[in-house]
């Protein structure tokens, strides 16, 4: 009798299983869109956490600028907790500069860097101009992106990521929107946040790519085109200021930026099923202080929780039960967490082959040896500290024998005007000007 009951239960489960699987396959696909907004985009992290807590599956994610960075990292498996920890431990003043660590600089260069407050690039030829276009090259930020995306340094199809991903940049050659669905992930993220005039653009083929916010700062249409039936959006853009609030040059400039970023905004909001608008009053794209980051994250969580009932109601529209639990997302296990990799060969792009011996000595690295991520980082600072290269980045690609480490170098063509102020008891103050 027991055997008969057991057989009946097994048969029932087998009959029900296909219906359960069919139901899951037939559910509507969910897309998340994350707007641009610089530092204000820190709010995205905690908003994603709340979406997860609501039991909403995320099938696609798209973003612009900081939304592209958070979205790209989330797409490869970073959890909101990992992202929270990562952003809090960064030295944002250093990251948002092209400063080189003192330990990698010669004594002369150390003394020079301490004298001058501002360093402004200028060029003398079209060849020089190709490496310019902004006050900050974003070297330290780009290297952070490379560290964070280890394991994804090849040119890949972003649809093949754990969560399909896309991000938006703008081609200033013709004003067109460029949607990254493939390529090198860290490069796509860097292009999407290249604020015009602040960060140098990313040059790819015949395109000159800058922050996607000027063409589509809230790309709900992009995530819909990817296949999303239901869209959840997190928007960290500032509301336009009234006339009585526009009292200074920074106010006017900020308003112009915000107006530019409004392109297609209302149309994309209309595509959104649950719209999470974060209160970012009092904060700007440059609010990277620890206190600001803490507040922005908290506001992101509060804004998402304010839409809690809407999120739960979405489950019915998606076609899942109230107690549905999506597949666990992450955590991302980066090579940078392992800290040591076996490197079989090292190459240098953008330089003469004959330079390799000198470069290997400068980097203090050896082929066919274990190399830490700290050693790679130090090698980058040594290369930039030599003052021979305007930029230095790297890729680390897995091979059957180990890893291939390639340094991408750009020879230094541009010159810079360095400005500083010197105080002493006799001259009181004097302006320091220097060209390098």
Which residue stretches match the model-derived regions?
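Bacterial Sec-dependent N-terminal signal peptides
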Residues: 1-27
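N-terminal periplasmic accessory domains that precede
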Residues: 401-411, 431-436
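Patatin-like phospholipase
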Residues: 21-64, 72-381, 385-392, 396-397, ...
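Solvent-exposed loop/turn segments connecting transmembrane beta-strands
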Residues: 42, 399-400, 422-430
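Transmembrane beta-strand segments that form the barrel wall of outer-membrane beta-barrel proteins
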Residues: 363, 395, 415-423, 431-436
